[in-house]
């Protein structure tokens, strides 16, 4: 993996050039280019096995790549589908993991307050609902003030109402902190609700791009994206 650091405030959140990744003889990502700007929210759709999570893991520095280049200011923050909280640590201690500098508890308290859990600093993960645990995971990511936030289907295991609440919270937090965001998801409606730009990945490459606009018809956008994913719908019956 080739990783080149930009000076802060002088570059996009991440720039990928000619990225390739293979498992054995199977090429999972093929000469992929991608730029995500500061404050831009990008959603990545695609069938299982198309390379979405492999791309996210490469951007996070969790997987090596065989070719290409990733330019980023510093290590990004990641929120996974599972919250990955340590059950033997309190909430604020979970948020503090890997956090450098002074005033750690105060900064963690502020982050937990942002996600609506400021009164539960010394509580334990076992006492949280699924949505609350994911809010702690978001606080843990954003307390780092990352230039790039990677979201790997973080709402997939939540019920419908909790997902809607989490969408609103994420939009609010991203607007406040202004990281570049890459959301990997299978949910077309989630992508439409959250993203400034929606990408469809197919066979290890970006096959389609949609840039959100105020004039967009959500139903038509949904139908177009489903078509790109190989799901044909009749707009009149949706």
Where are these regions (language model features)?
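Hydrophobic anchor residue at the start of the ABC signature
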Residues: 138
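Conserved ABC ATPase signature
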Residues: 124-128, 132
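A short, proline-enriched helix->beta-strand linker immediately N-terminal to the Walker B motif
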Residues: 143-147
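The feature captures the beta-strand-to-loop junction immediately N-terminal to the Walker
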Residues: 45-47
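Helix-to-loop junction immediately C-terminal to a conserved catalytic motif
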Residues: 60
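Conserved beta-strand-loop-alpha-helix hinge in the C-terminal portion
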Residues: 204-227
């Amino acid at each position: 993996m080739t990783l080149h650091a930009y000076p802060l405030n002088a570059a996009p959140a991440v720039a990928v050039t000619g990225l390739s990744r293979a498992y054995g003889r199977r090429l999972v990502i093929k000469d992929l280019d991608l730029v995500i700007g500061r404050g831009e929210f990008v959603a990545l759709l695609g069938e299982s096995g198309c390379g979405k999570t492999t791309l996210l893991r490469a951007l996070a520095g969790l997987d090596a790549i065989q070719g290409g280049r990733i330019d980023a200011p510093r290590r990004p923050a990641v929120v996974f589908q599972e919250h990955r909280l340590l059950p033997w640590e309190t909430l604020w201690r979970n948020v503090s993991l890997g956090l450098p500098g002074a005033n750690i508890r105060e900064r963690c308290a502020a982050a937990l307050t942002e996600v609506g859990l400021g009164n539960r600093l010394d509580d334990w993960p076992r006492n949280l609902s699924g949505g609350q645990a994911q809010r702690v995971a978001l606080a843990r990511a954003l307390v780092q003030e990352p230039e790039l936030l990677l979201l790997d289907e973080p709402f997939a295991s939540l019920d419908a109402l909790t997902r809607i609440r989490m969408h609103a919270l994420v939009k609010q937090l991203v607007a406040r902190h202004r990281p570049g965001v890459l959301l990997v998801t299978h949910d077309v409606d989630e992508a439409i609700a959250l993203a400034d730009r929606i990408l469809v990945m197919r066979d290890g490459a970006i096959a389609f791009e949609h840039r959100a606009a105020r004039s967009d018809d959500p139903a038509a956008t949904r139908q177009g994206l489903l078509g790109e994913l190989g799901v044909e719908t009749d707009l009149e019956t949706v």
